[in-house]
Design a protein with these regions (language model features):
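Positively charged n-region of N-terminal signal peptides that target proteins for export
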Residues: 1-4
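Bacterial N-terminal signal peptides
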Residues: 7-17
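Conserved functional micro-motifs across diverse proteins
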Residues: 22-217
């Protein structure tokens, strides 16, 4: 009987796609990624979402800002200190320097910026090259239901705090307009310059995360 079961099961396993048996494997622990910087009791890890299949509608909503040329980076902050740390998200930049191109410093986009750049150009050809970095939209048309829904969804996953509690890990997404040049992420550094211990107001040294070794996912 056991031999008969093995005779049936073994050919099925051999015929299965190589990746099928690992589809239910747990994703890697983000804190083990090599795209990190750590000092003064703070570890920061960056996980850029480089593939379209990572942009789940359940997480990011039905309107794909990735298809509009933007990328999300999931950033983890592990504060091992006894003191909380204040972060200024508005000073975070993605510094890109692909071969043969000038260095660019891209600011972190708000959910409103992402929605503007995704939805207000929805009827145009999003593949058309535009100024890089793309300028902030000015007085555009009124915001509709889709825009409100998208901004609410992105606010739910974006890095939404400027306080890193002691002995805790905080994470959230940052958004950057790559103008569809997603390969440039591998020639980029995530620059986080403005962090301060809240108890004694002492500034931390800046953090700079090389994204060259980001997983291809």
């Amino acid at each position: 009987m056991h031999r008969a079961i093995l005779t049936i099961v073994l050919p099925v396993l051999l015929l299965a796609p190589l990746g099928a048996l690992g589809q239910n494997a747990a994703p890697p622990d983000p804190m083990t990624l090599r795209t990190r910087d750590a000092h003064q009791g703070l570890t920061i890890v960056a996980d850029p979402f480089l593939k379209a299949d990572r942009y789940s509608k359940d997480v990011f909503g039905k309107n794909s800002f990735y298809n509009a040329g933007m990328v999300a980076i999931d950033v983890y902050f592990r504060n091992d200190n006894d003191s909380p740390i204040r972060l200024n998200p508005e000073t975070i930049e993605l510094v890109t320097s692909p071969p043969g191109q000038d260095r660019q410093r891209l600011g972190n986009l708000s959910p409103e910026d992402v929605a503007d750049r995704t939805l207000l150009t929805a009827n145009s050809n999003v593949r058309v090259r535009r100024p890089f970095p793309f300028p902030n939209p000015t007085n555009g048309p009124g915001h509709n239901k889709d825009w409100v829904e998208m901004t609410n969804t992105l606010h739910g996953v974006a890095l939404g705090t400027d306080i890193l509690p002691p002995h805790a890990t905080t994470h959230g997404f940052l958004f950057f307009d790559m103008n569809h040049d997603f390969g440039a992420v591998r020639y980029s550094h995530l620059f986080i310059p403005d962090l301060t211990f809240m108890t004694d107001k002492k500034a931390l040294f800046f953090f700079e995360i090389d994204l060259a070794d980001a997983p291809s996912r």
